[in-house]
A protein has these predicted regions:
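Nucleotide-activated chemistry modules centered on ATP-dependent adenylation/adenylyltransferase
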Residues: 1-302
Length: 302
């Protein structure tokens, strides 16, 4: 009698596929929030597996701040065509004009928190009752305590004190009219799990995840790449370094890490040796306050 056992990556994959199928069963109008980063790319791969041989039964939604890395945008468009998925793109720039919002000021003027308004408007426009995201619990303490099925009220707000139990992988997606649920199929994955899975499954990624040369300036110990949105001050020293990105956000709030890792194996070896989380090492917007992420999520952020 033969025994069938899953390794840990196969167990994580099976859990995520189960969550995707729960979404399809429980919600009428789900959507997958897609940024062109490694986590949302992994979500698309898992969604294809969950519904194969059919197409992904919901659209990919990208909230474009206008400050995205060009490599991520090019990859987004290519992947949407490759998997034959509907791609919905909404611009933060339009929201700023329509709502007369104030643009962030300062040296690194991140539109990250303004994405919330565009996301909530998009949910209202398409009547989405579920938005699937690529957040993981190892990234940040606010995400660590959020459920896989995270209920948002009619204003898109999250109350961490009112979360539903998820015993025995039973997920409750029942909501009142106007509410919606954010679902995180890879909550239990780590950054290392994601990279090992990408290597095993031979998943394509944007080139910025691997070592390349960029002009950067140093800000509070972080390397911020120069671009049309990030310009040096007179006292900044411009450096040219070999860097890669651990996470992909806006160019104005995402720092690079110094690296020579040009292959998947080399990236994985670097991750194994690091003791700093990807957001802790690279996200400027998370350092605004101690509870920056939780505050954004309470107001409707991803």
């Amino acid at each position: 009698m033969s025994s069938y056992q899953l390794n840990y990556l196969e167990q994580l994959e099976a859990e995520s596929i189960h969550i995707f199928r729960e979404v399809a069963a429980q919600f009428e109008r789900p959507a997958l929030l897609f940024s062109g980063g490694k986590d949302s790319i992994t979500l698309v791969h898992l969604a294809r597996k969950a519904f194969s041989p059919g197409a992904i039964p919901f659209p990919l939604v990208h909230i474009d701040t206008g400050h995205n890395f060009p490599e991520a945008l090019q990859f987004r468009d290519w992947l949407a065509k490759e998997v034959r998925a509907e791609l919905v793109v909404r611009q933060v720039e339009n929201t700023i004009l329509e709502r007369k919002l104030t643009e962030p000021k300062g040296k690194f003027p991140s539109r990250n928190w303004l994405q919330t308004y565009t996301l909530l408007d998009t949910i209202e426009e398409f009547k989405f009752d579920c938005c699937i995201g690529g957040a993981r619990r190892d990234e940040e303490k606010a995400r660590a305590k959020e459920r896989i099925f995270s209920v948002r009220d009619e204003f898109g707000q999250w109350d961490p004190k009112l979360q539903r139990p998820e015993l025995w992988s039973i997920y409750n997606g029942r909501i009142h009219k106007g509410e919606n649920v954010r679902v995180f199929p890879i909550s239990n994955w780590t950054e290392l799990d994601i990279w090992n899975y990408i290597r095993n499954e031979k998943i394509d990624l944007p080139s910025i995840y691997f070592a390349h040369e960029r002009e950067v300036i140093e800000h509070e110990g972080q390397l911020v790449a120069l671009s049309e949105y990030v310009q040096p001050d007179e006292d900044d020293i411009i450096l040219r370094k070999s860097v890669r990105y651990r996470t992909v956000g806006d160019m104005t709030c995402t720092a690079a890490v110094e690296s020579n890792a040009g292959t998947l194996d080399e990236v994985i070896n670097e991750i194994i040796s690091t003791r700093i989380s990807e957001r802790g090492e690279t996200r400027i917007d998370d350092k605004v306050t101690e509870a920056a992420m939780e505050d954004r999520k309470k107001n409707g952020y991803f």
